[in-house]
From Swiss-Prot:
It is a single-pass membrane protein. It is found in: Nucleus inner membrane; Cytoplasm; Nucleus, Nucleoplasm. It comes from Drosophila melanogaster. This is LEM domain-containing protein Bocksbeutel. The chain crosses the membrane at residues 377-397. Residues 49-103, 119-141, 233-287 are annotated as: Disordered. One of its GO terms (biological process) is cell division. Keywords: Cell cycle, Cell division, Cytoplasm, Endoplasmic reticulum, Membrane, Mitosis, Nucleus, Transmembrane, Transmembrane helix.
Amino acid sequence: MSDLSYLDTLGNKELLAKCLEHGLPGVPVTDSTRSVIIRRLKAKITGVPLNKSKSASKKAIPRRETVHGSQVTTPTSEPVRRTPGKSAGRTSSNNNKISEQSRRTIAYGLDNTSISGRSVQTTTTVSDMSSQSEDDDSYMVDSPVPNYSKDQQPRRYVSLAKSGVLTTSYTREVDQPLYEQEDIPRSYTYERPHVPAATLHALPTYEPRIEPSTYRPTDLGFSRPLLTQTNLNSTSYEESSTYNPKLSPISPRNTFSGSARPFGGPAPAPAPIRQRQSVPVSGSNLARGRLLQPTTAVNTLYPQLNEFYDQPNDAGEPMETESESEVEEVPINSHFQKNRFSPLARKPLVRHHDQVSPMAQFRALAVSLDQKYNLKFYLILVVSVMLATMVYVVLTPNA
């Protein structure tokens, strides 16, 4: 190796030429690959493999060895006689040979903790299966065979493979690594965090003063039946003389206030609640029916309906019921005639039963289009543009 020390003093180009001279691939020589190329070139010149020195320097690592053992039975010198129609039988000497000679276990441990960090103990079991290759037909040897009872009859050895040698290996980990326990949630049900309930701030309520009012009875002797809505929203009739609102033990409670004033403003004047006055019973009232009154005066959450039914009626007519009667057009027409010039007034819907002329239809169409698209504005714009164009053409001299 002393004669090859000159390779370290060669330049990159000279070293590349030396590699090509000895049949090595022309790899560019750099500072990082220079030492590797010099080592390969020395191995090529001396004829020594590159990895021989490395393999010799390394320590021998113990490897697991598997020992296979087999026991071959020698044929007996005694004559063999075949007995048809009988099951397979073995002598006690053959059983002893199989149990003592043909089965052995080699168990040893390898200390390879430096490689994998754990020691593995390997157990190899070698069995001789050559003696189990007999045919289904039995062969009986002329030797004294002891008589076995059913309880003491020897058990036949069952083979697990077709090969002559059965190898069983058991691997057991001596030191198992300890894994950290994963944080498994106890429940997958989301629990809402408990937040203390906020205090409720009740708004001030304004209860108007309840004053009894009189109801004017009609001169015709008719009295309007009292309409009262019970808790079950059912309406029934009873004689009006049996109920007196002044004698009720519980005063009616007003739960509705129509005031929309701000909190800091002055309180509005409470509107008095009208109450009906008892009217003597007449024959016509009995014919109409009687109003069943509840035991206590109940004021529902419908003050508008109560005010509607509390309005006085001078005509003395009975309660109005829904009927499909024709609507009178006279008050509607008079209303629109009074408010004709009002900005919010609508035109009356008048149905013309006679046939409308085409000119009237065209006029109505033009009016509707003018209201929707402003046709007058566009018409004036087009006419003005045409007039301006004509004036420009007349005043411009001909070229």
